[in-house]
Design a protein with these regions (language model features):
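Phosphate/NTP-binding elements of NTP-utilizing enzymes
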Residues: 1-166
Length: 166
């Protein structure tokens, strides 16, 4: 998301990392913050506001904001790019589907807009929005669904390996 922030051409664009918990939000924000602080050029170009988990490009006024998912923090987001982090945890949350729909709703008016879903695997079977997105990604990967705007990058152990318990 830092690359998107730096290469963005739209004045005052917004980028969002949506995390399912405060802990995951901190894990997403801290490396970006440290990247800026440890590079003199980036430090000159970007302002880091740790208390609101926001990095602002000083020239374009573009922001990268990391938010912990809550219906109150997600409403009204108008991002050009959104990264949904740890989707499997959203799968356990009540009304997560509505919250994610609200978070990416602003993309309709931005032709260059994008959404990235990232996750690790749960110890439990996939559930909720995680299960839905995982199945959709598998169907695109396997050619059951044609969606040229959706690129699934999935690492899964081969079914025979999972079944054997190796």
């Amino acid at each position: 998301m830092m690359t998107a922030l730096l290469l963005n051409w739209r004045q005052a664009a917004g980028y969002t990392i949506l995390a399912p918990t405060v802990e995951v939000a901190a894990n997403a924000f801290n490396p970006a913050r440290d990247m800026v602080r440890r590079d003199d050029d980036l430090d000159d170009l970007c302002q880091v506001q740790t208390h609101i988990r926001t990095i602002t490009h000083r020239v374009t006024d573009t922001t990268l904001k990391v938010v912990a998912a809550d219906p109150n923090t997600v409403s009204g987001i108008k991002s050009v790019g959104t990264l949904i982090d740890e989707l499997w945890l959203f799968g356990k949350q009540y009304k997560a589907e509505d919250m994610l729909r609200e978070a990416i709703g602003g993309l309709a008016s931005r032709p260059e807009g994008f959404v990235v879903y990232t996750t690790t695997q749960s110890n439990e079977p996939p559930a909720g929005v995680f299960r839905q997105k995982l199945q959709y990604a598998r169907d695109v990967r396997d050619g059951k669904i044609h969606d040229p705007h959706f690129l699934p990058v999935i690492f899964e152990h081969p079914p025979e390996m999972v079944e054997s318990g190796v």
